[in-house]
Design a protein with these regions (language model features):
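Mg2+-dependent phosphoryl-transfer enzymes with acidic/Ser/Thr/Gly-rich catalytic loops
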Residues: 1-4, 22, 183-260
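Residue-level signal for inorganic ion chemistry
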Residues: 32, 67, 148, 222, ...
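Asp-based phosphoryl-transfer active-site loop
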Residues: 3-18, 222
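Short, structured coil segments at secondary-structure junctions
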Residues: 56-59, 67, 168-170, 224-225, ...
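Short active-site oxyanion
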Residues: 36-40, 59-61, 147, 207-209, ...
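Short, acidic loop-to-helix structural element flanking the phosphoryl-transfer center
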Residues: 19-37, 80-87, 129-132, 188-200, ...
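Active-site phosphate-binding/coordination module
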Residues: 23-119
Length: 260
């Protein structure tokens, strides 16, 4: 029995340079709810941004935000990760040393950057739609850290990920999140463990779901549920962790609804 649906956002529900979700998805989520099936948005994005993306159904779904570092149900934080302050500083300093990249540091309240690059700031605030404050120095931030991400507009696979993996891979988990981001994940936090926590708190069996994803930060989530779909455009090897592939979450869920 399927009790929940969980889906990644970027590259899974949002494709290319799209900044808004397919309106059909909201109708599908409402139909799922009528059948007692709960929808969870699972993303590396911040919670407030996900609420805006899913505005028509924002109070009907749950959220696994910041790649599992922050889970919210019914407006209440279910779980919250934490990354050591000094480690955040080290990563931010390394990003500056590397050059040609930008950091986005997440707290439960908002995002921060010390980048002064106008194109990056415009991309985050207007294209992605994040809440983000600009600081001169990350050491000026006085809130607990739940995630740090690094952006390279030229893509992360060629050099950026290898650089940070070499310097920090033995101290913190590093995953690709979309094509231009790498995320540094709080200890014991990932989409799979976060999803398990949130559905278990709702009295559901974590195996009784359908999950969708396309990147390496989705692997634990895809392995959690009995039924899982990797996008046909997924990163190399991701499909090996899923039971099926699809080119459209909406199309797959429409077919699923027809079986109910």
């Amino acid at each position: 029995m399927i009790q929940y649906i969980a889906s990644d956002v970027d590259g899974t529900l949002l494709h290319g340079h799209a900044t808004t979700l397919n309106p059909e998805l909201f109708d599908i989520i409402r139909q799922l709810k009528e059948h007692g099936i709960h929808f969870i948005a699972a993303s590396g994005r911040q919670y407030k941004n996900l609420q805006r993306l899913f505005a028509p159904v924002k109070d009907d779904i749950s959220y696994v935000a910041e790649n599992g570092s922050m889970c919210v149900h019914d407006g209440k934080i279910v779980s919250l990760g934490h990354i050591d302050t000094d480690l955040i500083y080290e990563i931010a300093d390394a990003a500056k040393e590397y050059g040609h990249c930008h950091t986005l540091i997440s707290t439960a309240r908002t995002g921060y950057t010390d980048s002064q690059d106008p194109d990056y700031i415009d991309h985050i605030r207007n294209d992605v739609g994040y809440d983000m404050d600009i600081v001169q120095n990350v050491r000026d931030i006085k809130e607990p850290f739940i995630k740090i991400a690094v952006c390279d507009f030229d893509g992360t696979e060629k050099r950026l990920r290898a650089y940070f993996q070499e310097h920090f891979g033995d101290r913190i988990k590093i995953v690709t999140s979309g094509n231009i981001w790498i995320d540094f994940i709080a200890p014991n936090a990932n989409k799979g463990s976060a999803l398990s926590n949130i559905v278990s708190s709702l009295g559901m069996d974590p195996k009784n779901g359908i999950t969708f994803g396309d990147q390496y930060n989705d692997l634990e989530m895809l392995q959690l549920s009995n039924i899982s779909y990797a996008m046909t455009t997924a990163a190399t090897g991701v499909a090996d962790y899923a039971t099926h592939t699809t080119d459209s979450v909406e199309k797959t869920l429409r077919k699923f609804l027809q079986t109910l």
